[in-house]
């Protein structure tokens, strides 16, 4: 992908709070199902913001860091999803979202970020991302010392 969009921890917190505001009133939700692994951090932040104590995971494997591959459902809660928020960090091609809709037709599917190919599958999201953009999530990055410019020229 030719473009990158970097999300800092502060930005992720802000985006998740914005997403949480759209899910009010909180007492309408039985719980949160976070899609592992990308939805784990946003799911935890939403659980905190909404005061939701019941958090479970849906484990679907479709990426090896930056390469999409065949989708495998590793763990899935029972039911049709009624009363649950399914939380993702990103909807990209929409393949995972389509699978989630098939598995849980009555759940509310939300994500922090959405690309054009998948955003119509979501009930809510907060950040539009161009299709040709790779997202660097804060949990995939590390802070590092940067040499001052004047020292690089010696």
Swiss-Prot record:
Listed cofactors: Mg(2+)
Cellular location(s): Cell inner membrane
Entry GO terms, CC: cytosol; plasma membrane
EC number: 2.4.2.-, 2.4.2.22
Entry's Gene Ontology BP terms: GMP salvage; IMP salvage; purine ribonucleoside salvage; XMP salvage
Bilayer topology term: Peripheral membrane protein
Claim: Translocase is one of the keywords in the record: no
Keyword Ion transport annotated: no
Binding site for Mg(2+): 89
Residue numbers binding guanine: 92, 135
Sites where the protein binds 5-phospho-alpha-D-ribose 1-diphosphate: 37-38, 69, 88-96
Residues at which GMP binds: 69, 92-96, 134-135
Residues holding xanthine: 92, 135
Catalysis performed (reactions): GMP + diphosphate = guanine + 5-phospho-alpha-D-ribose 1-diphosphate; XMP + diphosphate = xanthine + 5-phospho-alpha-D-ribose 1-diphosphate; IMP + diphosphate = hypoxanthine + 5-phospho-alpha-D-ribose 1-diphosphate
Keywords, ordered alphabetically: Cell inner membrane, Cell membrane, Glycosyltransferase, Magnesium, Membrane, Metal-binding, Purine salvage, Transferase
Pathway the protein acts in: Purine metabolism; GMP biosynthesis via salvage pathway; GMP from guanine: step 1/1; Purine metabolism; XMP biosynthesis via salvage pathway; XMP from xanthine: step 1/1
An MF annotation (GO) of this entry: hypoxanthine phosphoribosyltransferase activity
InterPro entries membership: PRibTrfase_dom, PRTase-like, Xanthine_Guanine_PRibTrfase
Assembly mode: Homotetramer.
Main function: Purine salvage pathway enzyme that catalyzes the transfer of the ribosyl-5-phosphate group from 5-phospho-alpha-D-ribose 1-diphosphate (PRPP) to the N9 position of the 6-oxopurines guanine and xanthine to form the corresponding ribonucleotides GMP (guanosine 5'-monophosphate) and XMP (xanthosine 5'-monophosphate), with the release of PPi. To a lesser extent, also acts on hypoxanthine.
NCBIfam families the record matches: PRK09177.1 (NF006613), tet_prtrans_34 (NF000014)
Family to which the UniProt record says this protein belongs: Belongs to the purine/pyrimidine phosphoribosyltransferase family. XGPT subfamily.
Annotated PANTHER family: XANTHINE PHOSPHORIBOSYLTRANSFERASE, XANTHINE-GUANINE PHOSPHORIBOSYLTRANSFERASE
Entry protein name: Xanthine-guanine phosphoribosyltransferase
Organism: Vibrio vulnificus (strain YJ016)
Taxon lineage: Bacteria, Pseudomonadati, Pseudomonadota, Gammaproteobacteria, Vibrionales
Encoding gene, per UniProt annotation: gpt
């Amino acid at each position: 992908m030719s473009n990158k969009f970097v999300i800092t921890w502060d930005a992720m917190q802000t985006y998740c709070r914005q997403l949480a505001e759209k899910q009010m009133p909180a007492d309408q939700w039985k719980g949160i199902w976070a899609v592992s692994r990308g939805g784990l951090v946003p799911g935890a932040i939403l659980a905190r913001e909404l005061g939701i104590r019941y958090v479970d995971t849906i484990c679907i494997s479709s990426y090896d860091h930056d390469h999409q591959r065949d989708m495998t459902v590793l763990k899935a809660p029972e039911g049709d999803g009624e009363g649950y928020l399914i939380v993702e960090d990103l909807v990209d091609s929409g393949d995972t979202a389509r699978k989630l809709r098939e598995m849980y037709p009555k759940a509310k599917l939300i994500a922090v970020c959405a690309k054009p190919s998948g955003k119509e599958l979501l009930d809510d999201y907060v950040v539009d991302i161009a299709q040709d953009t790779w997202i660097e999530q804060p949990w995939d990055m590390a802070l590092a010392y940067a040499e001052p410019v004047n020292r690089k020229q010696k």
